[in-house]
Amino acid sequence: MEKRENPYLRYLRRERLPHIFCAGCGNGIVLNSFFKGMEMAGIDFDNIAMVSGIGCSSRIPGYVNCDSLHTTHGRPISFATGLKLGNPSLDVVVFTGDGDAAAIGGNHLIHGARRNIDMTVICINNSIYGMTGGQISPTFPEGSYGSTAPYGALEDPFDLAELVTAAGASYVARWTTAHPLQLANSIKKGLKNRGFSFIEAISQCPTYFGRKNRMRSPVEMMRFMKENSLNRRKALKMEPDEVEGKIIVGEFANRPQPELCEKICSMVDEKSGRALDMIRSAYRDD
């Protein structure tokens, strides 16, 4: 029987395989959903520029055969902003994680959303610092265990989708790795949106989060995410105590609005035109 090849292998740098991700990591699922969403959106792969910071998920662009920037910790959105302003015709995609985006990069995240600059940010949220030993991140669930929370986390976690929605992003969605088709569809919408798009992918880290919280199997973790998810449309009609502890998934914002690059270009055209009119007027007066 002929072995079928994954159709998305053509987008990868095969010479860099095998990857460094742990067995059962959700990064591969998210990348697969990205390729599917990209094809559904009709985006030209050669026009994509990927940007990432530091963390497990930030290693993803290194395996993708496109132009990419591997930047400093917490700064991928800043670099992506400069890239987009320098060449507005590019389709800029940021791969980041919960630590990279919500901790050291938190200010850059909310201001990127506020500016509504055209880029698609895919945040793989596994609630943990997986490259440095399993320290807890700003999205770590209260009461769960990590290497820096041996008796259980005491802090309330960030709700990234709600945070970015409040900051002004024009498209925001959240799914889990147990919802790959829905995730791909939201990535498609994010890529087609003219503005700041934020897609949060709740993912499993069996190596650190799973072992510390008695969910050693990736399948067990994904089953938990699937069974514990609740669509936002339904959640909005329920009482707060009914949705407590649930993973709220779905679209949080889909509101087209003026994009920063377009506003800058319009301003330049307007001001340049006025300057030329003033020069012509001066010559006519002479």
UniProtKB/Swiss-Prot annotation:
SUPFAM superfamilies: Thiamin diphosphate-binding fold (THDP-binding) (SSF52518). Keywords: Oxidoreductase. One of its GO terms (biological process) is organic acid metabolic process. This is 2-oxoglutarate synthase subunit KorB. InterPro entries: 2-oxoacid:Fd_oxidoreductase (IPR051457), THDP-binding (IPR029061), TPP_enzyme_TPP-bd (IPR011766). It is an enzyme of class 1 (oxidoreductase). Heterotetramer of the KorA, KorB, KorC and KorD subunits. GO terms for molecular function: 2-oxoglutarate synthase activity; thiamine pyrophosphate binding.
